[in-house]
UniProtKB/Swiss-Prot annotation:
The gene is nrdR. GO terms for biological process: negative regulation of DNA-templated transcription. Belongs to the NrdR family. Negatively regulates transcription of bacterial ribonucleotide reductase nrd genes and operons by binding to NrdR-boxes. Its cofactor is Zn(2+). A zinc finger (unnamed) spans 3-34. This is Transcriptional repressor NrdR.
Length: 154
């Protein structure tokens, strides 16, 4: 690894540690020329599928966009940030497991709705009302009936 201070190519690894999550390796290094120390991090690089929007355009998958939409749906609801992050991790796991290069925005939306339904029924209804573009009260009532039916079964 090239030293960021003097540019010398030879460095020595002094210490290596794994992050608690197990997805990052931290290495403490020392330059053999100038003797200065620096830290490097190694992370797994994941390639999410491109998201194909309804108009046919393609955009990169954006975790923050998913997180923001979930946080908006769950605003003032008793759902922790950790629970949202775990839900997003499950969504991303499903996106990666398909191994496809592209995925429709509708499929991403359905994955978000499934996770919101697990987390909080009110958040699910809020998201569904915007995502499915309800035109009238009957469509809203259908989703309410669906949620009520799942609560009765439990």
């Amino acid at each position: 690894m090239k030293c960021p201070f003097c540019g010398h190519a030879a460095t020595q690894v002094i210490d290596t540690r794994m992050s608690e999550e197990g997805d990052t390796v931290r290495r403490r290094r020392r330059c053999e020329s100038c003797d200065r120390r620096f830290t490097t991090y190694e992370r797994i690089e994941l390639f999410f599928p491109a998201v194909v929007k309804k108009n046919g355009s393609r955009v990169d998958y954006d975790r923050n966009k998913v997180k923001d939409s979930m946080r908006l749906a769950l605003r003032k609801r008793p759902v922790s940030a950790e629970a949202i992050d775990e839900a997003i991790a499950r969504i991303e796991e499903k996106l990666l497991s398909h191994g496809e290069k592209e995925i429709g925005s509708d499929r991403v939306g359905e994955l978000v709705m499934r996770e919101l339904k697990r987390l909080d029924k009110i958040g699910y209804i809020r998201f569904a009302s915007v995502y499915r573009s309800f035109e009238d009260l009957a469509e809203f009532r259908d989703v309410l009936d669906e949620v009520a039916a799942t609560n009765v079964r439990k």
